[in-house]
A protein has these predicted regions:
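A short glycine-rich, hydrophobically flanked beta-strand micro-motif that places a catalytic Asp/Glu
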Residues: 27-28, 84
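Conserved aromatic-histidine-acidic binding/catalytic patches
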Residues: 5, 52, 116
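Short, low-complexity N-terminal intrinsically disordered segments enriched in polar/charged residues
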Residues: 1-25, 31-35
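A generic "alpha-helical surface" signal
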Residues: 8-11, 55, 62, 119
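Hydrophobic pocket/interface hotspot
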Residues: 17, 29, 64, 101, ...
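Short helix-to-loop capping/linker segments positioned immediately adjacent to catalytic or ligand/cofactor-binding
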Residues: 17-19, 72-79, 112-115
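A solvent-exposed, acidic/Ser-Thr-rich amphipathic alpha-helical stretch
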Residues: 35-104
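A beta-strand edge to alpha-helix "cap/lid" segment located at domain peripheries
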Residues: 81-85, 90-157
């Protein structure tokens, strides 16, 4: 496979990423990221104001792996699942070695009793890089439209 970053490769990465989360294959989730990466879930207001912290903050693949281990082994939470709906990514920069895009998202949370609610809407601000032959996230900021977030965000967006 070519090492070029194309829209087709970005779409394939995003589709596989969402499938991983929506199908509860969370142990594979960190593999979508470089070893040195940034994953943040934040609000649009905090992002606009330049606040770096987030509802979820991880700056290494190891931190992402630890988050899933804690979710599976230590955290106590009501059983739930996500269903993601994505818009098409708008590639805002592509210099060959890395690329950036903005992708709108909506996440529906399905609770164990079958109740479904819109859980989050917003935009992914992504930076991609090629690692070997694979396209990976160097950075994924999930910028939520609302600053109102459930007190326990269990699953990654």
């Amino acid at each position: 496979m070519s090492s070029a970053i194309t829209l087709e490769r970005i779409l394939a990465l995003q589709a596989a990423y969402i499938r991983c989360i929506d199908n509860n294959a969370l142990e594979s989730w960190p593999d979508f990221f470089l070893d040195r990466c940034l994953y943040v879930v934040t609000s649009a207001e905090n992002h606009k104001n330049g606040f770096e912290g987030g509802i979820i903050y991880a700056d290494t693949k190891g931190m992402l792996t630890d988050r899933i281990a804690a979710l599976r082994e230590a955290n106590v939470y009501e059983k739930q699942a996500y269903r993601h709906i994505l818009g098409l990514p708008n590639v805002t920069r592509n210099d060959g070695d890395s690329a950036e895009s903005e992708t709108p998202f909506m996440v529906v949370r399905v609770m164990h009793d079958g109740k479904s609610d819109i859980f989050a809407t917003g935009v992914y601000l992504d930076t991609y890089q090629v690692a070997g032959t694979d396209l990976k996230f160097a950075r994924r900021l999930a910028v939520c439209d609302s600053s109102r977030v459930d007190t326990l965000m269990v699953l990654p967006l």
